[in-house]
C-alpha cells in the first residue's frame, strides 16, 4: 500500500466513523447537543452526512490509481480544499474541544495531501 493510499484509507475510516456515521445515525437531539445547532428536523444533519459520505466515496476512487503508480490529482486537490477549509472553519468557529480535535485531524490530512502534491513520487512509494 502506498503512503498516499494509507492517508486516504485513514481519512475514509476516521471520518466515516466519527463524522458521517453519527450524522446519519444519531438522534437529532444528540446531534444538536454535539454541534450546538438546532433545527426543526434531522434533515440538515442527514443531508450533511450524505455529503460527507459522497466525499469519502471520492477519496476511495483515489486509491486504485495510487496503487497503480498514477497520482490522483483531482482526488488530492478535492481533499486539500475539503480538509483545509474544514480545519480553518473549525478552528475559527470552534466552541469546544471536540471541534478542535477534528480541526487538528482535518488539518493534518490537508498537510499530508499538500506534501503528496509537492512530492508525488514519494507519496506513491509503498509504505511497506
Language model regions located:
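Helix-boundary and loop/linker segments of multi-pass membrane transporters
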Residues: 1, 36-37, 65-68
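Core segments of alpha-helical transmembrane spans in multipass integral membrane proteins
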Residues: 16-22, 41-64, 77-88
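Juxtamembrane helix-break-helix junctions at the cytosolic face
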Residues: 59-72, 91-96
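Non-cytosolic membrane-interface motifs at loop->transmembrane helix junctions
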Residues: 35-42, 70-75, 98-108
Amino acid at each position: 500500500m502506498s503512503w498516499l493510499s494509507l492517508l486516504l484509507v485513514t481519512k475514509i475510516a476516521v471520518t466515516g466513523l466519527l463524522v458521517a456515521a453519527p450524522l446519519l445515525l444519531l438522534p437529532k437531539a444528540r446531534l444538536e447537543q454535539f454541534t450546538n445547532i438546532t433545527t426543526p428536523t434531522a434533515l440538515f444533519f442527514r443531508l450533511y452526512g450524505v455529503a460527507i459520505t459522497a466525499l469519502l466515496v471520492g477519496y476511495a476512487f483515489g486509491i486504485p490509481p495510487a496503487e497503480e503508480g498514477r497520482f490522483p490529482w483531482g482526488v488530492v486537490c478535492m481533499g486539500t480544499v475539503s480538509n483545509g477549509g474544514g480545519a480553518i472553519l473549525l478552528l475559527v468557529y470552534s466552541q469546544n474541544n471536540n471541534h478542535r480535535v477534528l480541526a487538528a485531524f482535518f488539518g493534518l490530512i490537508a498537510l499530508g495531501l499538500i506534501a503528496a502534491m509537492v512530492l508525488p513520487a514519494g507519496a506513491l512509494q509503498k509504505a511497506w
